[in-house]
């Protein structure tokens, strides 16, 4: 596991005090979620980036992550979601790639004034997605 953590650390480039995002990777996000102790569901699932790694509608939210030094593949930016409908109450992963989703994530994350608050908001979003209540 120490090697896995070291691999994650080397994926994040730092130049002085400027934080540079690594490239989004669902495989790396999955590994980071598992390393953080997040239980992998027993149904078909995807490691979902709460703040999308490349979608144009998520640019501002990505800037917020960068501002607070949170990598796009950090476990705090992830949640396991079903890839099949109606297996659990969680949000269906493919349905989340929408303008409405990106705007709501951005609105919520914009309230963060520091790294801890940003992580807390990401955890809140993850919980809502896992419970299927994000759009309620």
Where are these regions (language model features)?
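Catalytic toxin/effector domains delivered as secreted proteins or via bacterial secretion systems
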Residues: 7-136
């Amino acid at each position: 596991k120490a090697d896995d953590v070291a691999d994650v650390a080397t994926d994040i480039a730092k130049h002085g005090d400027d934080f540079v995002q690594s490239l989004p990777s669902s495989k790396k996000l999955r590994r980071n979620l598992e390393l953080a102790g997040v239980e992998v569901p027993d149904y078909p699932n995807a490691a979902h980036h709460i703040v999308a790694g490349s979608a144009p509608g998520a640019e501002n939210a990505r800037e917020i992550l960068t501002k607070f030094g949170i990598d796009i593949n950090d476990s705090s930016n992830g949640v396991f979601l079903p890839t099949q409908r109606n297996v659990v109450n969680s949000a269906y992963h493919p349905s989340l790639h929408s303008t409405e989703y990106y705007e709501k994530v951005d609105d919520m994350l914009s309230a963060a004034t520091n790294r801890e608050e940003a992580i807390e908001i990401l955890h809140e979003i993850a919980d809502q997605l896992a419970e299927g209540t994000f759009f309620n």
